[in-house]
Amino acid sequence: MSTILIAIIALAVLAAIFGAILGFASIRFKVEADPIVDQIDAILPQTQCGQCGYPGCRPYAEAIANGDNINKCPPGGQATIEKLADLMGVEPEESAHDLDSKVPTVAFIHEDMCIGCTKCIQACPVDAIVGGTKAVHTVIKDECTGCDLCVAPCPTDCIEMIPVETTTDSWKWQLNAIPVVNITDAASDAANVKDSIK
């Protein structure tokens, strides 16, 4: 047998042995995740902005499962608080952040002042800033969550948080406040009223 064939067989046997060991270890030492943490994490907006005081949505979900307040997520707003309250079986709380008076904002980079240091790119938790080293950076407006984590690291202060223009696309439609009436029920109610008058 040639040495190349022996080497290939030896590598295949070693790969099979190590694969079996890894397969056994993954079954034997499997760590079960808490299903409530997964459910909470699915409700959170996944912006990873850190405004709640945790480094991301998953650590905040774990903290909520361990009894932390459900009202610390500004990007999620009151709707997320209500969903979390429903899931956890508690009363919805007011947001820990003043959501009503806070105007939604997005980052804006004054490109004539940008030196391309990439510090804002590294700070952005949602990858809403694009640009290369020593090149002008810009913000993808639709991706920006307005967390303002990119403002502090900028050495030239070229990043500004500007209010989001309200358009029909960005307006928060309060469709739940509009009463929905089933037409067939309304028609039968009207017929019953007409019959009772006769």
Swiss-Prot record:
Where [4Fe-4S] cluster 2 binds, per the record, is at C114, C117, C120, C154
GO MF, one example: 4 iron, 4 sulfur cluster binding
Q: Where is this region: Hydrophobic?
A: 1-26
Question: Which residues of the sequence carry a binding annotation for [4Fe-4S] cluster 1?
Answer: C49, C52, C57, C73
Instruction: Report the subcellular localization.
Output: Cell inner membrane
Mind naming one GO cellular-component term on file for this protein? Answer: plasma membrane
The record's keywords, sorted A to Z, are:
4Fe-4S, Cell inner membrane, Cell membrane, Electron transport, Iron, Iron-sulfur, Membrane, Metal-binding, Repeat, Translocase, Transport
What residues does [4Fe-4S] cluster 3 bind to? C124, C144, C147, C150
Residue ranges annotated for the 4Fe-4S ferredoxin-type domain, each copy included:
105-134, 135-164
Can you supply a Gene Ontology BP term from the record?
electron transport chain
Q: Which InterPro entries match?
A: 4Fe-4S_dom (IPR007202), 4Fe4S_Fe-S-bd (IPR017896), 4Fe4S_Fe_S_CS (IPR017900), Elect_transpt_cplx_RnfB/RsxB (IPR010207), RnfB/RsxB_Proteobac (IPR016463), RnfB_subfamily (IPR050294)
Q: Which residues form a coiled coil?
A: none
Keyword Electron transport, does the record have it? yes
EC class of the enzyme, as a word: translocase
Cofactor remark: Binds 3 [4Fe-4S] clusters.
Q: What does this protein do?
A: Part of a membrane-bound complex that couples electron transfer with translocation of ions across the membrane.
- Family indicated by similarity: Belongs to the 4Fe4S bacterial-type ferredoxin family. RnfB subfamily.
Q: How does it assemble?
A: The complex is composed of six subunits: RnfA, RnfB, RnfC, RnfD, RnfE and RnfG.
What name does the UniProt record give this protein?
Ion-translocating oxidoreductase complex subunit B
Supply the source organism for this entry. Answer: Vibrio parahaemolyticus serotype O3:K6 (strain RIMD 2210633)
Organism lineage reads as:
Bacteria, Pseudomonadati, Pseudomonadota, Gammaproteobacteria, Vibrionales
